[in-house]
Amino acid sequence: MFVLFEEAGKYLGGRVLSEAEASAQVELETGKRVKVKGANIVLRFEKPSPAELIAEGRALAASMDLDLAWEFAAEGEFGFADLAADYFSDKPSLAQQAAALFALFEAPHYFRRAGKGRFKKAPAEIVQQALAAIEKKKAIQAQIVEWAGQLAEGVCPAPVREQLYRILFKPDKNAPEYKAVVEASRASQRAPLELLERAGAIDSPYQFHWRRFLFENFPKGTGFPALVAPAIADELPLAEGVEAFSIDDSQTTEIDDALSVQGLGSGTVTVGIHIAAPGLALAPGSAIDQVARARMSTVYMPGYKITMLPDEVVDTYTLLEGADRPAVSLYARFDEATLELQSTETKLERVPIAANLRHDQLDSVVTQPWLEDGSITHEDTPAAAARFRPQLSFLHRLARQLKAQREVVRGKPENFNRPDYNFRLVGNDGAEPTGAEQVQITTRQRGAPLDLIVSEAMILANSSWGGWLGELGVPGLYRSQASLAPGIKVRMGTRALPHAGLGVKSYAWSTSPLRRYTDLVNQWQIIAAARHGKTAALAAPFKPKDADLFSILSGFDAAYAAYNGYQGGMERFWTLKYLEQQGITELEATVIKDLPNGALVRADALPLVFPVAGQQERGARLRVKLGGIADRAEGGGR
C-alpha cells in the first residue's frame, strides 16, 4: 500500500512498511524510511506509484480554474475530496482528488487551511484583494524585467535615474528600481556604478559627488521653510562713540563680526569686538533654531555655499554697514604703550556699523609698511581704508603682540608658510555650479595684515568668553587640545580646557553665530552671563551636564566633519579641472610623506596633494609630470 502524506509543508508519497495505531513506517522512493503520524496521511492507494500520482495530480491541478473551484466549494469547512467531487465528478479519480488537494493547498488567497486536508473558502473581498496584489506583483516584476533590459542596453529609465543615489548609497532592496539594477548588473556582468555610468544615469563627475553629498546630508533638499525672523524685544542701549567696521571678503553675506577702536592717543585704548546677536531674538527650540540645529553650519565649497540660516533671517541680524545693529560686544582695554590687557567687559547693545571692509579689495593697499609708516600713500587707497587707517594700524600692532604672546605659551611659532587658495567659478555668480565652469585659483598669503587683525581679535573674544563662562560655571561648547605632541587632536567638549595649538587657556567658538550652530549656542550662554552675572548658571538655556548640550556637540562634530570633507573634495575636483583647463602637464612639488611604493607630494603653487612613484626623501623638491588628469577629476570627491 502507498500513502500520500504532508511533511513540513510538502506532500510526499511512499510505501507503507508497517503501521501502528497512530503512525506508520513509510519508505520513500529514495529509499529513506520515515515515521509518519497517522493524522498527516491524506490518501491511501494501491496504484499508481506515488511519483506518478503526484506528477499527474500536479498537472491536473495546474489546469483547474480556481475562480470556478471557489464558486463550487461549500460555504463551511470541507475536505479536498469534497471539492474534487463538486469540481470533477461525483466519483473523482485518485488523480483528481490529488489535484484538488494540491490546488487547494497552493491557493491560500482562495482557500484557508482548516486542518490536514481540510479547508475553508476565503471571503470574497479577501480574494479580490489577494488577486489584485498578485496582479500588481506580476506587473512590478514585468517592469523590473523591462527596466533591467533597458539598463543592459545602455538606457537609463527615468524612475531609476530619480532613485539613483538611494540605489547606490542607501538602497531599499525591495524597491523595483533597485531590483532592476541588480538584475541588469547580473545579466551584463557589470558593477552597478559602471552599469549606471554606461546608461547615462550620471550626468557628470561633479553632479555625482554633489548629488551624493545632498542625498547623505540634505535628503529633504537645501530649501528653507517659510520663516520670519523675530524682532529683538530688548531695549538695547546705543554704543556711544563707537564706529565699527567689519573685515570680510566680497562674497560674505553673513557678516558676524566687526571691530572698533576708541581712545587712541589717550594712553588707554578700548578695542570693541562686536558679534551679530541672533541669540537675542531666537530662542532654543524655536522654528528657526530647529532649522539651524538640523544644519549645524553653513557649508562652503568653491563657487557656492549652503547657508545655515535663510537669507531673510541673516539679513535681519547681519552687521551691515549704515545702521545700528544689535550685537554682543566684548570691550578689551589695553595700555596703549605696552599693549597689556587691563580688563574686559561684555555688553548687549546696538552698535553703529560704519563700514564693511572687503580684504580682497584692500590687501594690496593695507600692507604692513602702510600700517606702520603713515607717510606711505597710495593714489588708489579706498576711502574706507584711509578713514580707518589709525584704527587698523593699532589693531595690527596689537594683533602681532597677541600672536607673539600665544606663541610663547604654545612653545613654537605658528607656521604660515602655505597660502590660502581662493576659487572663483567664472560667470557662476553664486548659482549652483554644474561642474563645467571655468575655474580661477588665486592665492592669499596667510597672516596678511587684515587676516591677522581679524583672526587675533576672534581668538581674543573666543578665549575671553570661554574663560568667563568657565568662571561663572556656565557650560558651553569648547575646543581644546591637551598638547602639541603627535597624535593629540583638537577635541570638542563642554568644559573650559586649554587649547595648546592656539596657546590659550580656553577657547569657545562664539564669533560666528550666523554660520555655526556652536557659536549660536554659546551666544545664548554669554547673553545669560551678561544679564545675570554670578547667577547665570541658573538662568542659562543649557545647564551643567545638560544632555541636550552633549547631543548638539555630537551632531555638530559629525556635520562639520562631513561638510569639511566635502569642501576639501570639491577643492580637489576644481584644482584638477584647473590643471585640465590650463593644459598644465607638470608641477613643482615637495615630498611630505613616504609611501610603501612611492611618496606623497604637495604641489607648491596649487592646493593639491597626490602620490608619485619612486622613493623620495621627505622635503625633497620635485618636478612631477602629470598624467590622466581628466580621469582623476572624476574622483574629485574621494
Language model segments and positions:
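Electropositive polyanion-binding surfaces
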Residues: 10-12, 19, 31, 39-41, ...
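Nucleic-acid-interacting cores, centered on viral/eukaryotic replication and modification enzymes
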Residues: 97
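Accessory beta->alpha helical hairpin/"wing" motif in late/C-terminal subdomains of nucleic-acid enzymes
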Residues: 114-129
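Short, amphipathic alpha-helical interaction segments positioned at domain boundaries
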Residues: 127-149
